[in-house]
Every structure is written in C-alpha cells, then in structure tokens.
C-alpha cells in the first residue's frame, strides 16, 4: 500500500502503537482493514469516533474498511479496571447491535467498488463455536501466563478477581481477526490503544492458525490536557452519538467549549482538515484566543459529521437567539428545550410565585432576592431577550415560548430557563 495514509496518521498523531509499519506499507492495494465496536450501550459515544474515522481515512486513501459490530463480544465484555461487568440480556444486546450498526454505517461509504465498506456481526460465526471447538481450536493457542500479564487482568486479580467469562474475551476478539482474514482477506486491525493486547493476540492467532502475516495499529485514547475525562456532557453522562441521548445542541456546545490546549489536537484527530487549515487555526488560537475560531470550527465539523447540516444550523441559530442575536420565537420547541436543558432550569408549578425576583433566585441566576433586585436595578436582566428593570414584573401567558418556556439572561452570557409545568 502507499505510505501516504501512514504518513497522514503520523502527522495527525494518530499512531499510538503498531506492528512493523514498513511491512504494512508494503501490503498490496487495496488493503482490507477492520475495527470492532461492542454494543455495551444503546449508542456509540464520542470516544469511538477516533478509530471509526480512522477507518474512513483508510477508505479515502483507497482501502476497504470492515466495520464489526460485536454482537458476540458485547455479550461478554472486555475486562475493565473497575470490576466485573453486568451481563446484558441477549435481546438487549441484539437490539443495541442493530442500533449501533446503523450508526456505524453513517461514517463509511458503501458501494460496489473495491473500497466499498462491509458491516459484519461477530455473532454470525461465534455462535457456531461449540465448547469443544473453543477449547481445542482457540484455547490451545493461548498461554495463560501471557493472558495473566495483561495490566487490566493483573489489577483485577489484585482486587476482587476476574471471571472466566471476561478472562476469555481476548480469545473471542482474536478469533474475529482469523474469520475476517479468512473471509475477506483482512490484513489490518485498528482500535484504541487500550485494545493493543487483544489486537496482538489476534495477529498471533492468524499466524498460528492460517500461517499468514497480518498487522495491528492503535490510535490514542482521547484525553483532555487538564486530566479531565473526555466525552462527558454537562450532566456528567457520556457524549452519545444518538441525538435522543445527547442533543445536537449539547454535542455542539461540548466541542465549542474545548480548551485552547486541546482544540488543535482534537481537530487533527476528529476532522479531515488539511495541515494548512490546521496551521491557520493554530495561529489564530495563539494570536486571538478570545475569538475561539478553532473551537467554532471543531464544533461545526463534528456536529455536521454526526447530526447533519440542518441540525447544525438549528444549533447555531439557537445559540445566537439565546444570547440576543436572533429571534427566539423562530426556534422550534425541541431545539429550545434541548438548549435550555443544558443550563439551569427552574420548574414553575401552578400557583408558585412567578415574579421576576422569584424566578431569578429559583433559576440560580441570583443567589438571593437582594442580589436579584440589585441586578435588576443595574439593567442586567432580560427575559426572552427583552430587558426587564421592574421588580414587580411577572410573565403573562403569552410570554411563554411554545406555551411553557422563558429564557432568562443575566448580563451578556449567563443563561437559565424557566419551564412552566
């Protein structure tokens, strides 16, 4: 294969570990490459995008991607540091597999060409394995000593231990590589750097069972420069690709709020912008950080990628409207609700005090009634982008957007919502 894709992955900082890169570059073109994604939740999350987009980069470079949905491995679960996973019911895993399969199909191109993507489910071959075949045909090739040396396994053994179910996960993932090489001629597996041990086990198993040389490459796990966990939304949950779980507004705002120390790295990893474009954004961040040009570009690129152009424009319009630069009345109910729920929302029950002072305190925009009156006197309060300076102001039914929402703003940038119940 041409070394161009490896060069690109290199300058983007997307190669964490690999087998022999020179041997990989010498592979015939087009090469078949795969990455696997287990359905351990009803949706993929933002962290999955780096290996998933790596598949897309290989496809754009002239290679064929295989996207594997782990219908079998998702029923087992890769060992993790924090303890034994809860086993999900087979019907639940099957449902999640189909949902995730639909998400995976959005990121690579399917056609009849040599580079047309393939989506597979490892349950198709794993459920045919008998216990005897698993032990004789797979287990015989694995050293328990090597398996015990995995960092995660070692830490689990030092704690509450590990079940044989999770301990055997490596064998199932390794067998996926054997099946994909046998069925599709796959010669490269990519994944997150935490999967290196499992991927290398597959490389060895292909060599031992089929006498073939295949390759491995991992991408870095995404972390923030300040040590905080990447991909956690405002409420502390994961940043999901499913808009029913993480709204497009929350998705956009998460990436728009990326720190200067992280934004250029994220642009290299999550977008297809050229080195020249990235260089310009890096200079803009260094010289004019207050303009947040790189963050704006990152948020737009990723929101278009995951949610589409129309949803991205709706999010941008909502952001402008909330901060007084657009018409709140033009926002649809779903977009307005999603945007306000990313702020502090006060619930207004029937008969509850609804004066502006009460609303400012209830929404958290003011810490006390005295502070609320002071802010009103300074002209720093608006409701639905209309300045309010009277302490006796209270909303009329016609003030509630879509019959239930008020947008409160203190100063220029601090927003809260009121939801009429």
UniProtKB/Swiss-Prot annotation:
Catalysis performed (reactions): tRNA(Tyr) + L-tyrosine + ATP = L-tyrosyl-tRNA(Tyr) + AMP + diphosphate + H(+)
Residues involved in ATP binding: 232
GO molecular function: ATP binding; RNA binding; tyrosine-tRNA ligase activity
Sequence motif: 'KMSKS' region, positions: 229-233
InterPro entries xrefs: aa-tRNA-synth_I_CS, aa-tRNA-synth_Ic, Rossmann-like_a/b/a_fold, S4_RNA-bd, S4_RNA-bd_sf, SYY-like_C, Tyr-tRNA-ligase, Tyr-tRNA-ligase_bac-type
SUPFAM superfamilies, per the entry: Alpha-L RNA-binding motif, Nucleotidylyl transferase
Ranges for domain S4 RNA-binding: 354-420
E.C. designation(s): 6.1.1.1
CDD domains recorded: S4, TyrRS_core
Residues reported in the UniProt entry to bind L-tyrosine: 34, 169, 173
Example of a GO cellular component annotation carried by this entry: cytosol
Family: Belongs to the class-I aminoacyl-tRNA synthetase family. TyrS type 1 subfamily.
Subunit description: Homodimer.
UniProt function note: Catalyzes the attachment of tyrosine to tRNA(Tyr) in a two-step reaction: tyrosine is first activated by ATP to form Tyr-AMP and then transferred to the acceptor end of tRNA(Tyr).
Official protein name in the record: Tyrosine--tRNA ligase
Species for this entry: Mycolicibacterium paratuberculosis (strain ATCC BAA-968 / K-10) (Mycobacterium paratuberculosis)
């Amino acid at each position: 294969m041409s070394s161009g894709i490896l060069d690109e992955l290199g300058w983007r900082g997307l190669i964490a570990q690999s087998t022999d890169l020179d041997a990989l570059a010498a592979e015939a073109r087009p090469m078949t490459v795969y990455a696997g994604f287990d359905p351990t939740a009803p949706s993929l999350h933002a962290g999955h995008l780096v290996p998933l987009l790596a598949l897309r980069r290989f496809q754009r470079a002239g290679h064929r991607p295989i996207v594997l949905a782990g219908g079998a491995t998702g029923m087992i679960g890769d060992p993790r540091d924090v303890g034994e996973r809860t086993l999900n019911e087979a019907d639940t895993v099957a449902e999640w597999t189909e949902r995730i399969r639909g998400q995976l199909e959005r990121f690579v191109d399917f056609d009849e060409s040599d580079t047309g993507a393939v989506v597979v489910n490892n349950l198709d071959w794993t459920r045919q394995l008998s216990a005897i075949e698993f032990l004789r045909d797979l287990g015989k090739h694995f050293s328990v000593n090597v398996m015990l040396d995995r960092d995660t396994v070692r830490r689990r053994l030092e704690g509450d231990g590990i079940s044989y179910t999770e301990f055997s996960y490596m064998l199932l993932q390794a067998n996926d590589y054997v099946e994909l090489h046998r069925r599709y001629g796959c010669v490269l597996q990519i994944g997150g750097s935490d999967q290196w041990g499992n991927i290398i086990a597959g490389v060895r198993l292909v060599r031992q069972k089929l006498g073939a040389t295949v390759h491995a490459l991992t991408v870095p796990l995404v972390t923030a420069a300040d040590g905080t966990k990447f991909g956690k939304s405002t409420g502390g949950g994961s940043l999901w690709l499913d808009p029913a779980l993480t709204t497009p507004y929350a998705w956009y705002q998460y990436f728009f709020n990326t720190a200067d120390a992280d934004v250029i790295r994220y642009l290299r990893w999550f977008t297809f912008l050229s080195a020249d474009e990235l260089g310009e954004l890096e200079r803009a961040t260094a010289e004019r950080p207050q303009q947040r040009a790189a963050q704006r570009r990152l948020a737009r690129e990723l929101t278009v990628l995951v949610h589409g152009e129309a949803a991205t424009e709706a999010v941008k319009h909502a952001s402008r409207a909330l901060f007084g630069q657009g018409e709140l009345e033009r926002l649809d109910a779903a977009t307005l609700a999603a945007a306000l729920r990313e702020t502090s929302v006060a619930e207004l029950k029937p008969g509850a005090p609804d004066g502006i002072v009460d609303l400012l305190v209830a929404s958290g925009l003011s810490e006390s009634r005295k502070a609320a009156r002071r802010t009103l006197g300074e002209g720093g309060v608006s409701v639905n982008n209309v300045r309010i300076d009277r302490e006796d102001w209270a909303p009329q039914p016609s003030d509630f957007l879509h019959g239930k929402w008020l947008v409160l703003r203190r100063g220029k940038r601090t927003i809260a919502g009121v939801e009429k119940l």
